[in-house]
């Protein structure tokens, strides 16, 4: 049985970004209730709330009375599927027409270039980890396309007259294909809009930002990347884990648990990944962790290597499981961690001030916020 520890960490430094904003008429409406919205972007319920929030309505709409029941958790997935953002296409076309007309009127001599596209990393979850440049760009955007891992706290920074469009993906459900996202970015940039593509973490670390940048540059669109704090850095700092440390770890390696080829076997694990002097950080690795852990031990990584899994890192819902590699997969399953979860494997994990709370005989589930 896992040893459960509750370690209090002061939340006084966490700014309250969730003040009610009733003036966001271009963004809100339908059944969205800003007063009751949680900051967690990771459940289907919040996917529904985001869908409702992001309806682009160009006419006055009375909000649904608070007494109106929202879909039950069991209905959420069906609700999201039946209300796919394809229903927003008519409004997208309207917005494109408005932007194109505005662009033509504002042009001098009929020579107008396309708008700019920014790929913006929003960090691992805590809005205070945003860069100043990211905040400035977010607040100046005409249109923002955002992913599942972008927190509601970050979305509260969007200007009142900006337009939001959710293009996130979950296992088994993609609100938009990658190709459709490319076309949306291109069409609005060609219409002269300032377009921001919001991504969790860093856009160029397992975020497919390179694909979007390459596509747009081939179409003659200028793309600027605003880096974000990737989950590995943000979460390691949160737990006091140095990813490299003199005499302990001389390198760090980022891996992905999702292979484009599919399947459950982590094909990305090579023999040199089992180097005891290397820190391994695995993104999206919950499904392949049992195979990964076994393969690492088969290649010589000691079975007592410290490891940690962090669910929803740097957010108020963060949960953390510490364990030795031989018990890691079992303890994660026992704790019921869900995506998004980051995994760190290596001797540096033992340097975390939270690690001494765990005994050699037991794993440790820590709720740190």
Swiss-Prot record:
The keyword Manganese does not apply. GO terms for cellular component: chloroplast. It is an enzyme of class 2 (transferase). Pathway: Porphyrin-containing compound metabolism; siroheme biosynthesis; precorrin-2 from uroporphyrinogen III: step 1/1. SUPFAM superfamilies: Tetrapyrrole methylase (SSF53790). Residues 1-28 form a transit peptide. Its EC number is 2.1.1.107. Coiled coil: none annotated. PROSITE patterns: SUMT_1, SUMT_2. Keywords: Chloroplast, Methyltransferase, Plastid, Porphyrin biosynthesis, S-adenosyl-L-methionine, Transferase, Transit peptide. Disruption phenotype: Embryo lethal. Induction: By light. Accumulates within two hours in etiolated seedlings exposed to light. It catalyses: uroporphyrinogen III + 2 S-adenosyl-L-methionine = precorrin-2 + 2 S-adenosyl-L-homocysteine + H(+). S-adenosyl-L-homocysteine binds at residues 124, 200-202, 230-231, 284, 341. It comes from the Eukaryota. Its main location: plastid. Signal peptide: none annotated. It is found in: Plastid, Chloroplast. One of its GO terms (molecular function) is uroporphyrin-III C-methyltransferase activity. PANTHER family: S-ADENOSYL-L-METHIONINE-DEPENDENT UROPORPHYRINOGEN III METHYLTRANSFERASE, CHLOROPLASTIC, SIROHEME SYNTHASE-RELATED. Belongs to the precorrin methyltransferase family. Essential protein required for siroheme biosynthesis. It is a step in the biosynthesis of siroheme. Promotes nitrogen and sulfur assimilation as well as photosynthesis efficiency by triggering chlorophyll, nitrite reductase (NiR) and sulfite reductase (SiR) biosynthesis. This is S-adenosyl-L-methionine-dependent uroporphyrinogen III methyltransferase, chloroplastic.
């Amino acid at each position: 049985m896992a040893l459960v520890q509750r370690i209090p960490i002061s939340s006084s430094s966490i700014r309250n970004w969730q003040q009610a904003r009733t003036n966001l008429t271009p963004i809100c409406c339908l059944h969205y209730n800003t007063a009751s919205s949680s900051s967690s972007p990771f459940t289907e319920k919040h996917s529904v709330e985001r869908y409702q929030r992001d309806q682009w309505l160009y006419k006055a709409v009375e909000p649904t009375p608070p007494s109106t029941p929202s879909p039950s958790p069991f209905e959420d997935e069906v609700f999201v599927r039946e209300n796919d953002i394809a229903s927003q296409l008519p409004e997208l076309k309207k917005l494109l027409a408005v932007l194109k007309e505005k662009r033509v009127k504002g042009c001098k001599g009929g020579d107008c270039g396309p708008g700019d596209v920014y790929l913006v990393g929003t960090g691992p979850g805590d809005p205070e980890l945003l860069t100043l440049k990211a905040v400035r760009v977010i607040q100046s955007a005409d249109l923002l396309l955002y992913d599942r891992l972008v927190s509601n706290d970050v979305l509260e920074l969007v200007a009142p007259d900006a337009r939001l469009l959710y293009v996130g993906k979950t296992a088994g459900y993609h609100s938009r294909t990658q190709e459709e996202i490319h076309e949306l970015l291109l069409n609005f940039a060609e219409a002269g809009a300032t377009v921001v593509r919001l991504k969790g973490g860093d856009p160029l670390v397992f975020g497919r930002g390179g694909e979007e940048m390459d596509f747009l540059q081939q179409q003659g669109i200028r793309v600027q990347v605003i880096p974000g704090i990737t989950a590995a850095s943000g979460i390691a700092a949160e737990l006091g884990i140095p990813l490299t440390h003199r005499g302990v770890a001389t390198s760090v390696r980022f891996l992905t648990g999702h292979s484009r080829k599919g399947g459950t076997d982590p094909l990305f694990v090579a023999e040199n990944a089992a180097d005891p002097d290397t820190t391994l950080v695995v993104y999206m690795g919950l499904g392949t962790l049992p195979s990964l852990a076994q393969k690492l031990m088969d290649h010589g990584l000691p079975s007592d290597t410290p490891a940690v899994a962090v669910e929803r890192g740097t957010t108020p819902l963060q949960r953390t499981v510490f364990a030795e590699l031989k018990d890691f997969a079992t303890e994660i399953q026992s704790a019921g961690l869900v995506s998004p979860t980051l995994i760190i494997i290596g001797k540096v994990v033992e340097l975390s001030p939270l690690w001494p709370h765990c005994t050699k005989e037991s794993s440790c589930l820590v709720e740190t916020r």
